[in-house]
Amino acid sequence: MTVEAFISALNDAGITLTEQQIEQFQRYFELLVEANKQFNLTAITDEKDVYLKHFYDSLTVAIYVKALQHQSSTLIDVGTGAGFPSLPLKIAFPQLKITMVDALQKRVRFLQDVVDTLDLKNVSIVHGRAEDIGQNVAYREQFDFATARALARTSVLAEYTLPFVKVGGALLVMKGAAAEQELADGQQALATLGGTLSSAFDFKLPNGDQRVIQVVDKHKKTPKKYPRQAGTPNKKPIA
């Protein structure tokens, strides 16, 4: 996906970027490729692939969950890695208040460099494990939305993310082709943690890759015991 195709595809979806935003995406790409030479941030470094599989893919969640486009929502991105989907969302929709969580200090430093270089406001970067931060009252049940992209299977991902979402908010799960089976396997975890699937959107990226966005509404508080201590959700998923 060329830069021009990226802009055009967003226009077709009703999202118009300013010149400044287009420049911010290009600078983000440059910073990503440069930092990737020092340590592994992503296997995707070709410009056309980054614009499709990182930038455009990240923004698809706002195409289907339009509240992200217009409201000054609080959003936490758990296991953000190189900043996806939260940084593309922040660039495209500056009114969002973003918190990014990652367990690796090198990635946190990279994210801070991007935020500083692009002069992004209302962005917080938290270094640590989701299981630990999810028990911190400063973050627990404080967010309108939580996102996670390719973080873990749904039953595990739910325990990492739903504790951050306030009652009345939603978890936005971004998955590939295996999403339906994962969701079926994760139903007990969602219910236990206070979530209910409200909608799902199946679509394809312009290159034909299958994607699914699942919206999980938070309808009751997460029991205090969740998330369990670091490592436990992955070893012993809620079932």
Curated annotation (Swiss-Prot):
UniProt KW Cytoplasm keyword: yes
Keyword terms of this UniProt record: Cytoplasm, Methyltransferase, rRNA processing, S-adenosyl-L-methionine, Transferase
Broad class of where this protein is predominantly found: cytoplasm
Location within or outside the cell: Cytoplasm
Segments of skewed composition (Basic residues): 218-227
Pfam families (UniProt xref): GidB
Binding annotation for S-adenosyl-L-methionine: 79, 84, 130-131, 149
Similarity remark: Belongs to the methyltransferase superfamily. RNA methyltransferase RsmG family.
Function: Specifically methylates the N7 position of a guanine in 16S rRNA.
Protein's recorded name: Ribosomal RNA small subunit methyltransferase G
